[in-house]
Structure formats: C-alpha cells, structure tokens
Amino acid sequence: MPAEGLLGQAKRLLVGEPIPSHLAHHERFSRFTGLAVLSSDALSSVAYATEEILRVLVLVSIGVLSFATPIAFVIAAILAIVVFSYRQTIHAYPSGGGAYIVAKDNLGEMPALVAAASLLIDYVLTVAVSIAAGVAAITSAVPEWHVNRIEMTLAFVLVLMLGNLRGIRESGRIFAVPTYLFVFSLLGLIAFGAWRAATGSIHPIATDVPIQPAGDTLTLFLLLTAFSNGCTAMTGVEAVSNGVPAFKPPESKNAASTMIMMAVLSITMFVGITLLAHAYHVVPSEQETVVSQIARGVFGGRGWPYYAVQGATMLILVLAANTAYADFPRLASILARDRYVPRQLMNQGDHLAFSNGIIGLSVFASILLVVYGGDTHSLIPLYMIGVFVSFTLSQAGMVVHWRKLKGPGWRTSAFINGLGAMVTGIVLIVVALTKSREGAWIILLLIPVHVFLFRATRRHYDEVARQLSLDGWTNGTRHRNTVLVPMSGVHRAVVQALEYAKTLSTDVRAVYVSIDPAATSQLCGQWKKWGDGVPLVVLESPYRSLMEPLLEYIEQVDAEQPDDFVTIVLPEFVPARWWHHVFHNQRALLIKGALLFRPNVVVTSVPFHLRN
C-alpha cells in the first residue's frame, strides 16, 4: 500500500470521515452543547477563584479570610455587568469575532489588533492553565504520578486536539457530559452545604495547616491583589460572544440565552463556594484545594459524594481548555481573512473545523506546558491581562457603535457598555499593577510584539497583492522557452522526459555533467541512438561537483535571453515503496531547491513510476 494510503487511513481513524460542506449547519451548537463547549472555561474557574482570593488574605491572618465574601460579591456584580454588556454585543454582531470585530469597526486598526493579540495569547494560556490545574488535581490524589505531570498534560492536549479535529458536533458530545456533571455536582454540594447551615449542623473543617500569627498588614494593595486573583472567575466570559456563528439559527438568540445561563451558573457557584468556605472556616492549603476541603466537610468525609465532586472538578478543569479550542481557531480564521495572520488559518478541514488553528493552539500550549513544567502557579500570573484588555476594548467599541447608530434606546445601551468599559478598565489596571511582579509583564510585552507581527504580515500580503495586480499590465509580449533536461545517464526515464520536453519548445537541450571521461564517452555513444536529434550539452566538472556546473549553465542560458523562460524538465524516479527512497539520490529535489527563487526559471518533474 502506498504511503499516502497509510497516512490517509490513519487520519480517518483519528478524526473520522470527511463531512461535506452542505452539512455544515448540522455541525453547529444547540444551547445545550454550546453551554458545555463555550462555557466550560468560565464555569471551571469557580473551582479555584475562591481559593485564589483566600491565598492572598491568609498572608495577613486567618481572621481576615471573611473579606473573601464581600470581594466575591463585588466580582459577581462586575461579572453581571460584563455579561449584560456582551449580550448586547451578540445581538449587534451576530457574525462573531468578539472584541476584535467590535474594536475594528468602531475604534480602528490598532485597538483591534491589540484586542486580537490579547485574546489569542489568553486562549493559549487557557489551555495551558486549565490542563495543568486538572493534572494537578489528579496528582494530588495519586502523588506517584507527579513525576509524569508534563507527559500527562501533553497527553490531554493531544486528546483535546483530536476531539476538536473530529468536528464541532462530536466535540460537543464528548465534552457535554463532564461539564454538566461538574455543574450538578457543585450545585448539589452548595445545596447540601446550605441545608447543613440552615439546620445548624456545620462543624469547622479539620485542617493540617498550622495557625500562624498575623503576617502582613491588611493594606489596600493586598485587598486589590485578592480581588485581582478572584477575577479569574470572569475568565472565559467572552467565549460565547466570539463563537456566535457556531450556534444553530437563530444564532444571536441562542448565544445570548447561553450567555445568561452561563452567568447565572457561574455567579451561583462562585458565591456559593465562597460562602461555604466562610461557613466552614476553610484555610487554603498547599496539600488540599478549597473545594476539596468544603466537599469533605459538607459530606462528612471522603465518601463517594466527595470523590464525585473531585472527579467532576478534575474533568472540568481539563476540559475547560476546550473553550479555547472553539474560539482560538475561529478568531484566527477571521484574522487570516483580514490578512493579519497566514492564510492557512482560514481554511476548514475535512470535519468543518479550522484544523490548522486547532493544531497551532495545541503546539503553543504544549510549549508553554513544557517550559513551565506543567506548574499551574507559574502559569496563573500570566493569565487575565489579555482577558481584561479585550473586555475593555470591546465595551469601549460598543459605546462608539451605539453613538454612531443612535437608534431607539441607544443612550441606555451606550450607558450599559460604557459602565462595562469603565469597570473592566479599572480591573485591568488593578490586575496589571498587582500581577506584574509575578510575571504578567511578559504578556504586556508579548501583546505589542504580536501587533507588530500582525502588521508585518498584512504589509506582506498587501505587497503581494500589489505585485499580482493586473492594473496597467498588458500582455503583448510573446516569450521564447528554452527547455533543459538534466540527466545522469541514458534510460527510459530520460527518454520519457525528452518526449515531454519536446511538447514545450523547439529549443530542447539535454545536459550532462561529466566527472568520468570514460563514462562520458559511453554516454555520448548511447545518445546518438536514443537522443532523437536533441542536442547534448556536456559540462566539465574538474572538482567533481554535479550541481555547480549545472547551475552555472542555467544562469548562462538565462542571461543570454533575460526576457524569455528557461524550463528545467527533471526525470524523476517514483519508487513503489516509500522506503525505497533511501536507495536513490535526491538530486532532483536539490535542483528544485536551488532554482526555487530564480525568476524566469520554471522547474517541472516528469515522474517515472517504478514497479514493485
């Protein structure tokens, strides 16, 4: 079986049979699958958002952990504002694209590219952080696996990549069960914990964390740091807005309903977990997560309900990365359409998924996981900057949008988006100030670097379009064509190449590089019989180089006729087995590479298929 057949069968086994374009509408999300695929990032963040707040407050003393509750309510209020703002964006921009499209239409090129860079970087970090956190949950339960955490993170990236390459509908089916399992298990935990609180059956959780004397003074900076840490609960909110075209018709209505459901669930679970952490006097620990401690306290130990919560939490943390797999390729395709990234990212694969974007996201996330050793705490400081940059630009762009339209109720709409822009802008400043010392400055550096690359890519495509333009061009000149057939001997492949060459031009020459005089004399004798009147050019090579004399001769012919074409016809063996290639030199490939960037020189191969 040929190599192409083996590769094709392997591809079909991994990603399934191709899907025709006319079935694209069947591959879209319902609200049920849309909530699972596009909201898993936002929903999963509640698993560690409360803990991130407590980890800062405990630096002062256990006594100030109660400040987590008002901080959580403030974050919940901001989340509600952002969701209502994005809901307006969904209806105003049903084509998707989120912050990039809104900023491009209303704020101009530069803000749009900043938004795009922020989102693309954040999507890569979403995959890395989510998978690292999920693997951390596994290795906490099975410490022996800790040494293999990098391999495990890469394995999960591979699973997510293959799942998404199979297409939108199948990825929705794969990821719906873990998402809803997490939602129901956490809501059950909160409901049972609330019932225990109402009946007065709450007992503080036993912990191995030593009680430490007061450390730092509770300052405004520490409160802001705790607040910025808790804002991880807001990551992923923009995913639904970016993925509107992935929904079944009516797209905007289904996406808006999905966003409201996501907001209600996220706020309920985040505030519920924070209240339970306060009720059970949970102290953050390096050995056990806050959700684990709450589940242990609510369910009275490590029974099956506890393991159900932990298992669901682990799954959602890993699968939260799937939100990025839904949105990164789609945003990249929009940027490719606008010529800011390579055009290959615009193409859909066999399964109507943006395959190149999916593979690229997997590669970048894998690099991050390897560089940072799969450590969640090393990756989290890089998080959130991109989110709030895109939030702020999107909402500011919507204010301009409503001011330009001035339709019914435009002032109310502009006020809602203006409030969203102001709030997210303030949060962005807080996050940038409190996270820069922990590595967020890298993201602040990467965003302008990406913008520079976007603009450089656009300049390249614009220059290509200018050079390819037919404006002012006349096709009045007839060009001659000199055809050269390099050969290493006289055989069937050469004779076949000569027959083809004679169909291209009347000026055909065979070219042979002489290294051995005896072999050259023998070849000249054979050429009289098989050359069919085609002139034979023999090039001497005193230093035994095959390439240099040939390239010099091609350059000489080209210089003699600078406005005409020179065509190189290469006789080329095609072995019956892929491994037979090792028995043949790759001279044809070397010639192609050497002539690739030479103008007016055309290189073509005439394959001679060898039988088995």
Model-assigned labels for residue ranges:
Residues A194-S201, S257-Q293:
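Extracellular/periplasmic helix-exit of transmembrane alpha-helices
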